[in-house]
Amino acid sequence: MTQSTQAATSLTMTRRIKGKREDVFAAWTDPEIFKRWWGPPGTTTTAAEIDARVGGAYRVTMRLPEGEVVYLKGEFLEVDRPSKLVYTWAWEEDGGIGPESRVTVAFAAAGGETDVTLIHEQLPSEESRDRHSHGWIGCLDNLTEMFSGKDA
């Protein structure tokens, strides 16, 4: 894969969240908190299983606005509490598993707030990158709202 192809199939986002790093990290690893903010607008996260340890698995069940239920799953490759998560990402598709990509989320203390930097790489295409970008913006908007006191 060339450098330009790698850049074309990855995305990076940074968001400042009004919460302590430990609390923001927990929002990614505690299933009950996670379900409150995960997903783009109109999507409901109905179940989340999260075993946030190296080699641990996660599986998320989401209901899309049009009613379709989709499943996301992966494995934690790195868990550095409360600084960093690295995990694989794959959609369950047609009874199988779709292409696997990789997500890195870094949590940096910024006074009483937290800078969250997200890198989603190894996406299968530019179209996939664009769809995931839309989803991540919605997720981070919800997370920001939840920590601002306006529950997502």
Each predicted region: which residue ranges?
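Hydrophobic ligand-binding cavity/cleft-lining segments
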Residues: 1-44
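Intrinsic-disorder/low-complexity, polar/charged segments enriched in Ser/Thr/Lys/Arg/Asp/Glu/Gln
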Residues: 8-14, 21, 45, 57, ...
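Short beta-edge strand/loop motif at the mouth of beta-sheet-based domains
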Residues: 12-13, 32-69, 151
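Hydrophobic/aromatic beta-strand elements that line small-molecule binding cavities or substrate pockets
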Residues: 15, 48, 72-78, 101-108
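A short, structured loop/turn motif at beta-sheet edges
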Residues: 21-22, 51-53, 77-84, 106-115
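Hydrophobic pocket/interface hotspot
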Residues: 24, 34, 58, 76, ...
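Helix-adjacent hinge/juxtasegments
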Residues: 59-81, 87
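Beta-strand/loop substructures that line and gate deep hydrophobic ligand-binding cavities in soluble
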Residues: 86-137
